[in-house]
Amino acid sequence: MSYRFLTVRAFGFTGFHCDATRLLSETEVIDVPSSLDFVGETELRLETAWPQCEENCYTILPRFNVQVDFEYYPVRVEIVCRVCAASLSVIFSKWDFYCSRRGHFVPVDQNGDLFRIGTLQETGEKYFYFCDKSICRQCIIQAAHHHS
């Protein structure tokens, strides 16, 4: 059983669906990101983890103006918890990266805070959350108990 709690809407990007057969629309909803990673400086990858060991990976490529020195166009990402309706809008720009080891870039929000990844103790399922006071984590745990 998978729990679809979080949705992601990204604006101002060009990207492909995980099967690379179609373009994502700019307002397409992407379910259940368990991690949100920048690869290098241009690529936003959303990974959705499923209990059946099936993974859906999405890549969002921020726009560049190739005519004028690869000018960067920021990407706005809105993450919404479907349970508690809390949301966070983040503007990713060329400088909004926290560089960790091995050249891996982790996105930071406008306050410089890293997005958080948690794990459900009952199932070991990883999930992505951003709410203050771990609101989304509690939503997921309560819903998991409700569905068990």
UniProtKB/Swiss-Prot annotation:
Keywords for the protein's UniProt record, in alphabetical order: Host-virus interaction, Inhibition of host innate immune response by virus, Suppressor of RNA silencing, Transport, Viral immunoevasion, Viral movement protein
Superkingdom classification of source: Viruses
BP term (GO), one: symbiont-mediated suppression of host innate immune response
Function noted in UniProt: Transports viral genome to neighboring plant cells directly through plasmosdesmata, without any budding. The movement protein allows efficient cell to cell propagation, by bypassing the host cell wall barrier (Potential). Likely acts as a suppressor of RNA-mediated gene silencing, also known as post-transcriptional gene silencing (PTGS), a mechanism of plant viral defense that performs sequence-specific inhibition of viral mRNAs expression.
Name of this chain's protein: Movement protein P1
Organism: Southern bean mosaic virus (isolate Bean/United States/Arkansas) (SBMV)
